[in-house]
Amino acid sequence: MAAPLRALAVAGGGESSESEDDGWEIGYLDRTAQKLKGPLPVEERQETFKKALTTGNISLVEELLDSGISVNTSFQYGWTSLMYAASVSNVQLVRVLLDRGANASFDKDKQTVLITACSARGSEEKILKCVELLLSRNADPNVACRRLMTPIMYAARDGHPQVVALLVAHGAEVNTQDENGYTALTWAARQGHKNVVLKLLELGANKMIQTKDGKTPSEIAKRNKHLEIFSLLSLTLNSLEGKFHQLTKEESICKLLRTDSDKEKDHLFSSYTAFGDLELFLHGLGLEHMTDLLKEREITLRHLLTMRKDELAKNGITSRDQQKIMAALKELEVEEIKFGELPEVAKLEISGDEFLNFLLKLNKQCGHLIAAVQNIITELPVNSHKIVLEWASPRNFTSVCEELVSNVEDLSEEVCKLKDLIQKLQNERENDPTHIPLMEEVSTWNSRILKRTAITVCGFGFLLFICKLTFQRK
């Protein structure tokens, strides 16, 4: 038995249809094959055609087309069968209709089939396949709707980086603006789609284009509380912009879309690798060429943020790149933990001041770490649906936290050993008859004797003064 599937088909970008009572029964998907029992009148055939489209009954659609129904038939509010199929991301139906001669460039009041496909409420994989089919039939990626929004803006707004890349590879303009002055980059920043922002920057998006109210994409991101994207757009250098903009269509498709050879042939462009934290940091500084080097040396972002300049040089990072990294660390106020260099344990002349300084620094840094974790706990949202930015799998965070707990336990154990060792040394030193106290110790002892003597004398003097007053009153 086929399960019901609820879905609404609306015009892209929130544009409503001209007629609310259009006769479409959208939302029930029944893949049970149905066949015509005989010739039907024209009106009844059109009604059956609509039901076949809404239920996704491809065999019935083909049979009706064979019976003489035009593939470009317009229904009550002006949509064609191809437009509806694109609105629900039905790849097989789109392919059948195109093969039967459906017009991929059709539009209703400037609402094109391609815009409808890019604004569909399906998975990115299905949307990508529908868009690829339409582009292969010469659909224009730069035709805008009544709000002057182009297909790439809808794809960016809905968070589809692969669709954005495919549209640009077929000639879509990256920096066009809609009626409010929004570009595709502005839409991605507004909605908090980090991967789309990165992809658009690579494709030549201009982050300085302002909306009609004078806001840049970074300001739009900040206003909508997408602080990670705000920082990314603020730090991103011009070397990242337009990285692939001058490539040919074939080169763009090859570089921007990664396919999975283990899947079926019709599952084109089904795999996309998102940027990790390290890649995001490097891309933001225009140092994406360092990605392979750091990964080869197994240097994580956490490790990179704590490396000193000499360590950067040892790992093959040039002086110019070192300056960019150090400047970014300073701008981000990343405090480098400096514990100082302890003398070798083998030496007997261990400086007490230096050792005490190390312990004080260690204690201070532990306090900073505790405060940082407490701050993170208070800032994290309680419910998962409140998380706006794209996160990796929670298992990754859990595993790191487990490792942190283990490291903290190891640290506690080692500090206890250090404490016991120091206590043992102190006891042996106090019980050693041959021990000669240092000058500081002698001086301290003498000062203590003098203080006690002075206090004693003052006490006797005060007592005599009280006794004298008492005697005089009597």
Curated annotation (Swiss-Prot):
InterPro entries: Ankyrin_rpt (IPR002110), Ankyrin_rpt-contain_sf (IPR036770), Asz1_SAM (IPR042650), SAM (IPR001660), SAM/pointed_sf (IPR013761). Its main location: cytoplasm. It is found in: Cytoplasm. Disulfide bonds: none annotated. ANK repeats lie at residues 44-73, 77-106, 109-143, 147-176, 180-209, 213-242. The modification Phosphoserine is found at residues 16-17, 19. One of its GO terms (biological process) is transposable element silencing. CDD domains: SAM_ASZ1 (cd09521). One of its GO terms (cellular component) is pi-body. Residues 271-333 form the SAM domain. Keywords: ANK repeat, Cytoplasm, Developmental protein, Differentiation, Meiosis, Phosphoprotein, Repeat, RNA-mediated gene silencing, Spermatogenesis. It comes from the Eukaryota. Interacts with DDX4, PIWIL1, RANBP9 and TDRD1. Plays a central role during spermatogenesis by repressing transposable elements and preventing their mobilization, which is essential for the germline integrity. Acts via the piRNA metabolic process, which mediates the repression of transposable elements during meiosis by forming complexes composed of piRNAs and Piwi proteins and governs the methylation and subsequent repression of transposons. Its association with pi-bodies suggests a participation in the primary piRNAs metabolic process. This is Ankyrin repeat, SAM and basic leucine zipper domain-containing protein 1. It comes from Muntiacus muntjak. The gene is ASZ1.
